[in-house]
Amino acid sequence: MTTQLEQLRKLTTVVADTGDIEAIAKYTPEDATTNPSLILKAAQIAEYAPLIDASIEYAKAQSNDKAQQVQDTCDMLAVSIGKEILKVVPGRISTEIDACLSYDTEGSIAKARQLIKMYNEAGITNDRILIKLASTWEGIRAAEVLEKEGINCNLTLLFSFAQARACAEAGVFLISPFVGRIMDWYKAKEGRDFEPSEDPGVISVAGIYNYYKEHGYKTVVMGASFRNIGEILELAGCDRLTISPNLLQELEDATGEVVEKLIDTNGNKECPAAMTHAEFLWDHNQDPMAVEKLAEGIRNFAVDQGKLEEMIAAKL
């Protein structure tokens, strides 16, 4: 029998959730996603040392201000890693903007434009890039502007239905609802494990997927943040799934049957009026898990961004 990874590929676009080019080349995904934590991890791989050195040289040529040099080095490093990854994936790379801009619409737009400019100057066209933004109201508004400029966005740290609905209404290209982190919260709260079919993260993503398809929204649903292959298999049929190398290996080693769980209904239900800012905040706030996990996710990405900046500053 074929492997579960091979079977899954027939139902879902498989994406690698890593900045490790060797791992990406091994599993031949369509796309790859990175985030500040993964860039920090990748920056510690010996093979990437020349990319760091080249990024520092670039930054020094742009400015004499050390703080600006650190920012420019981090941006160029993320783009350089993305460019290397694009040599081994046929599709897109997702590159995330600084988590410190999560509540700054104008700052997010400016940073996204800067990253796109750097990619374009490196010969990478917009159709191979997704700019990752946190699914805050401000991040969603930034994405709405960027999409109209032909800059496709990946809205991440998505935990609530309110976030998912607002993203679809803003016309964003893709969302990354987090499965495992939702399950983590409920596991800690209820003190028990969940079967994949009753996993709160799985149920959340399936609900978002079905809502999008019933209403004809074009936004791509890419399940993310998996803790085990059971969660992945319960979402077989989702538009895309971004999976870490260790779980890709588990799927490669397993041969049980993979059944399509999510099916596009091609619905045409009337879409509700777009949410107002007040409605978004109210609805999101009704979900304590989502409120806590969004804030925690932004803080954690900011911590890893800070560690990367410290590492770069020490080399300048």
From Swiss-Prot:
Active site residues of this protein: K132 (schiff-base intermediate with substrate)
Pfam family, one: TAL_FSA
Subcellular location: Cytoplasm
InterPro entries the record matches: Aldolase_TIM (IPR013785), TAL/FSA (IPR001585), Transaldolase_1 (IPR004730), Transaldolase_AS (IPR018225)
Metabolic or biological pathway, per its Swiss-Prot or TrEMBL entry: Carbohydrate degradation; pentose phosphate pathway; D-glyceraldehyde 3-phosphate and beta-D-fructose 6-phosphate from D-ribose 5-phosphate and D-xylulose 5-phosphate (non-oxidative stage): step 2/3
Reaction(s) catalysed (UniProt annotation): D-sedoheptulose 7-phosphate + D-glyceraldehyde 3-phosphate = D-erythrose 4-phosphate + beta-D-fructose 6-phosphate
GO molecular function, one term: transaldolase activity
Chief location bin: cytoplasm
CDD domains: Transaldolase_TalAB (cd00957)
Keywords in alphabetical order: Cytoplasm, Pentose shunt, Schiff base, Transferase
GO cellular component: cytosol
Documented EC number(s): 2.2.1.2
An example Gene Ontology biological process: pentose-phosphate shunt
Major enzyme class: transferase
Superkingdom of origin organism: Bacteria
UniProt similarity note: Belongs to the transaldolase family. Type 1 subfamily.
Family matches, as PANTHER family: TRANSALDOLASE
HAMAP family from the UniProt entry: Transaldolase_1
Subunit field text: Homodimer.
Job description of the protein: Transaldolase is important for the balance of metabolites in the pentose-phosphate pathway.
Full protein name: Transaldolase
Organism, scientific name: Aliivibrio salmonicida (strain LFI1238)
